[in-house]
Amino acid sequence: MVSEMTPTRRVMAAVLGGRVDYVPPANPLAQTTTELMQICNASWPKAHFDSKMMADLAAAPYEICGIEAARPQFDISLEAEVLGCKLDWNKPDRPPVTGPAYTDPADITWPDNLEEAGRIPVVLGAIEELRKRYDGMLPVIPVLTSPFTVAGHIAGVENLVRWTKTDPEKAHAFIEAATDFVIAYGKLQTAYGAHILFPADPSASGDLISGETYKEFVLPAHKRMAKEISCPLILHICGDTSKLLPYIKQSGIDCFSFDAVPVWYCRQVMGNEMSILGSLDVIDLMPNGTPEQVYNRTRECILQGADIVGTACDVSFGTSLENLRAYVRACKETPIPKYDDVEDIIRQIGVGIGRNMKENVLGGMQK
């Protein structure tokens, strides 16, 4: 029996494959719901430019709902903006990139003093504020937009994906330049006090690229991040990553946060080589489901082998505080299961349901 832990110790242990007193509700996806923003008097776009407001909003899920993580930086366009992309600030929440900034990877540049570049000082200030406010008790987990996605922003996603087939040398050059920048920014976040980094690489989704493309173009970048950034990493990739999982677990990254893959299947593929974080639906369950449904789904994630429970993507604005609290309560009230393999998981969640999942869901993935 593990004695009561602080959120930071609990989340660190879960990410690194250690013992915990319960599966932590440590969601590193953005949780900027309308209610939370109203409670902490935050607004767009000011929360993207004000370190204090960013820290307040990042801490609100913990203060109001008990979610055991603070995630400063709410968008994944900051890195591309520093590299020269224009953003659309007319959107009501997170600014998207309006278009590519480069056609030739040799032209890519960024400011010499990264600490003062773009909105990076805002994020670094929020990290410092959160570390000071909680004295290390609450894990600070800023997002770090990852190389394939950054390369897609600055070159154009369609261009980058096409070049992986038609001009692989050019694709590699864009990804390598993006990797250099991402690692430099990640080291800064760590130096300013981040406990864990949350590399998000949505453009590396299995919905956009094949497993072989991931292996050739993305995996080397993820390996570099794991080797060159000193703090633990939780990698997130959206969509169906079933064909990518065997390669992702070779990355050296500590934990994988996933979207459209069954928890038990991710657990089976990763085994004990990588912690997993998953995966509450944000399209229907979190904004439209009842607290009871959220509670039950959270329990299912734990029973199927999740080391940490979080959402499949950023939480929608309309998600209620009651649903966020139900997710936290389920984590705290569900005993940690002990399984030897996926067959034990199947027996626990029901032979009929489990066998059907294994034959139909897994069979569909492998086609």
UniProtKB/Swiss-Prot annotation:
Keyword Transmembrane appears in the UniProt entry: no
Pfam families: URO-D (PF01208)
Binding-site list for Zn(2+): 236, 238, 313
Enzyme Commission number(s): 2.1.1.251
Cofactor: Zn(2+)
Cofactor note: Binds 1 zinc ion per subunit.
GO terms of biological process kind: methanogenesis; methylation; one-carbon metabolic process; porphyrin-containing compound biosynthetic process
Catalytic activity: methanethiol + coenzyme M = methyl-coenzyme M + hydrogen sulfide + H(+)
Principal EC category: transferase
Alphabetized UniProt keyword annotations: Metal-binding, Methanogenesis, Methyltransferase, Transferase, Zinc
GO molecular function: metal ion binding; methylthiol:coenzyme M methyltransferase activity; uroporphyrinogen decarboxylase activity
Alphabetized InterPro entries for the sequence: Methanogen_methyltrans (IPR052024), Mtase_MtaA_CmuA (IPR006360), UROD/MetE-like_sf (IPR038071), Uroporphyrinogen_deCOase (IPR000257)
Subunit structure: Homodimer.
Family the UniProt entry places it in: Belongs to the uroporphyrinogen decarboxylase family.
UniProt function note: Methyltransferase involved in methanogenesis from methylated-thiols. Catalyzes two successive steps: mediates the transfer of a methyl group from the substrate to the cobalt cofactor of a methylated-thiol-specific corrinoid protein (MtsB), and the subsequent transfer of the methyl group from the corrinoid protein to coenzyme M.
Name of protein: Methylated-thiol--coenzyme M methyltransferase
Species the sequence originates in: Methanosarcina barkeri
